[in-house]
C-alpha cells in the first residue's frame, strides 16, 4: 500500500538531506548551511527575517545559523542601508569561491532524485510541488 503524501514527502526530504550531507561533508558544510548560502547567493543583502521567510525556519534558528556561517567565514553581516536595526547578509570571497561546487552538488542530487522521470514528468512534478507549497504559504 502506498504511503500518504505527508509520509512520502518526509521520507524524500530525509533521503535528499542525507545525500546532500554526504556530498557536502568534504567541504565542511551541511545541507542546512548549504541552503543558506544558496539563498544568500540569489538574494545578496537579504535580511535575517527575509532569510527566515525563504527558508521557513524560526528566527532563533536563523540567527544561530547565520552567526555560525559568519564565524566560519562563509558570509558577512553588514548593517542594512535601509534599516540600521537589521543586518544585510552577503557571501564572502570564501563563500563565493565555493559556489561552483555547490551548484554541481545541487545538479547531481537533482539528477539522482529525478532519474526515473521523463523531462515532462520532472516538469510536472516540480509544478505540483510548487503548487502544493504555495497552497501552504497562502493558508496563513
Regions found by a protein language model. Give the residues of each.
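Charged, amphipathic alpha-helical coiled-coil/dimerization segments
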Residues: 17, 67-130
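Residue-level detection of the helix-turn-helix DNA-binding "recognition helix"
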Residues: 21, 25, 56, 67, ...
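Short alpha-helical "packing" element that flanks the helix-turn-helix/winged-helix DNA-binding module
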Residues: 36-37
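Residues within helix-turn-helix
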Residues: 48-49, 60, 67, 87
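The alpha-helix within a helix-turn-helix
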Residues: 52
Amino acid at each position: 500500500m502506498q504511503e500518504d503524501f505527508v509520509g512520502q514527502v518526509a521520507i524524500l526530504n530525509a533521503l535528499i538531506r542525507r545525500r546532500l550531507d554526504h556530498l557536502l561533508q568534504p567541504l565542511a558544510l551541511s545541507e542546512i548551511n548549504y541552503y543558506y548560502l544558496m539563498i544568500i547567493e540569489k538574494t545578496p543583502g537579504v535580511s535575517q527575517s527575509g532569510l527566515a521567510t525563504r527558508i521557513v525556519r524560526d528566527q532563533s534558528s536563523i540567527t544561530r545559523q547565520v552567526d555560525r556561517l559568519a564565524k566560519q567565514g562563509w558570509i558577512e553581516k553588514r548593517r542594512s542601508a535601509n534599516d540600521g536595526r537589521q543586518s544585510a547578509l552577503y557571501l564572502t570571497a570564501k563563500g563565493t569561491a565555493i559556489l561552483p561546487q555547490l551548484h554541481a552538488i545541487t545538479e547531481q542530487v537533482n539528477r539522482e532524485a529525478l532519474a526515473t522521470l521523463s523531462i515532462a514528468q520532472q516538469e510536472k512534478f516540480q509544478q505540483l510541488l510548487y503548487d502544493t507549497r504555495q497552497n501552504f504559504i497562502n493558508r496563513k
